[in-house]
C-alpha cells in the first residue's frame, strides 16, 4: 500500500547521515506521530530534510504517521502528548524544546514522549 503524503506542521544524497557542519552541511531531524495508535518515530543528523522525514516515518511504522516537527543543525524537537492531542515544538536546546512542547500541550496529563537533537 502506498504511503500517504508527508504532512508537515510548521513550528519551525549523501551515503551517510553523518556529515560535518564545518564542511558547510546542515543536519536535519524530524519527529513523526500517529495519533490513533500512539506510534512515533524520530530521526536526527541526516543530510537532507527528506531523509530525516522518511527515516522518522519509517521508524514510526504506521502508514498514517505524519511528521509533526522538523529541526536543523544545533536545534532540538520534542513531542508532548496529552488529552488534547500531540504538540510538537522546536528549540535551541533540549530543555527549550521540551518546555515549549509541554506549554503548548497545557494539560496536566501532558508528557514528553520523544525528543531529538541535531549536531
Language model feature labels by segment:
Residues 1-119:
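Helix-coil modules at protein/domain termini and other flexible surface or pore-lining loops
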